[in-house]
Amino acid sequence: MPKIKSNSGAAKRFKKTAHGFKHKQSFRSHILTKKSTKRKRQLRGMKQIHDADKQLIQRMLPNL
């Protein structure tokens, strides 16, 4: 049997936590001049993925 491989794109985007996975928010990389300071501040940091997506992420990352 071959080794089970993780999806390399998903491995770069999601980090495992005690209660699931966290990810970086989108809309924060470029074209930031027209976005308000409040919006950019709220997009900072990592967020938890929704419960509906948890099983899909676990299937893509079996070794985490």
From Swiss-Prot:
Endpoints of the signal sequence? none
Picking any one GO molecular function of the record gives: structural constituent of ribosome
Instruction: Look up keyword Ribonucleoprotein and say if it applies.
Output: yes
**A single GO CC term, please?**
cytosolic large ribosomal subunit
Q: Name one GO biological process term.
A: translation
Matching SUPFAM superfamilies, A to Z?
L35p-like (SSF143034)
Alphabetically ordered keywords of this record:
Ribonucleoprotein, Ribosomal protein
Disordered: region residues: 1-54
**One matching Pfam family, short form?**
Ribosomal_L35p
Q: Which InterPro entries match?
A: Ribosomal_bL35, Ribosomal_bL35-like, Ribosomal_bL35_CS, Ribosomal_bL35_sf
Superkingdom classification of source: Bacteria
- Residue ranges under compositional bias (Basic residues)? 12-44
**Which NCBIfam families does the record match to this protein?**
rpmI_bact
**Family under the similarity heading:** Belongs to the bacterial ribosomal protein bL35 family.
The cross-references to HAMAP family, in alphabetical order and at most eight, read: Ribosomal_bL35 (MF_00514)
Q: What is this protein called?
A: Large ribosomal subunit protein bL35
The gene name on file is: rpmI
